[in-house]
Amino acid sequence: KALYESLSRTSAEYIKAKLSSIKKINNGYQIRLDNDENITCQLLIGADGALSRTRELAGIEFSTTNYNQQAIICNITTTNDFEDTTWQRFLSDSIVAVLPLSNTQASIVWSANNHLAEDLISLSNEDFVKRLENATEHRFGRLKVASDIYSFPLIERSAKDYVKENLALVGDAAHNIHPLAGQGANLGFSDA
């Protein structure tokens, strides 16, 4: 939200469309969007995530490492105050992180092997909360799931080339890592 608000204070134009094709031209790229709009640019920056369409269309190869784990994510609310403190616990079979969004709301990232993750994602919200309260040692009072619960596979990806003539990949389009260290966003900011 903050990034979109910052964008509105600049001369940058936000176009809600997906990348259909790119074509290298003498001094940059010609880009075609799925709304049939064509754009020409001198520098194409792919900042479009781990499954980067820019990287794919540019033909940039990448390596992958499958961690055989999933990240389970959701938002929760609590009866206690998170006190603006991020909290992480390393369990024998998983890692749970609590990332405050406000005094009483937080985002959960629970990294677990595929088998445990499938078990957790199949639980009712009530049973999921019980497991989460145990995993967080009941530090945050009574928890309640405040969003849908999602999961996604944890796969490290690294582009063979981050830069080509008139093109650069940044953030997860260039490299993404396990969320354990919480450094993905920092790496992306460093790229920019």
Identify what each model region corresponds to.
Residues 40-42, 164-165:
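Active-site acidic short loop of glycosyltransferases
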Residues 189-192:
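Internal hydrophobic alpha-helix adjacent to the cofactor/substrate pocket in enzyme cavities
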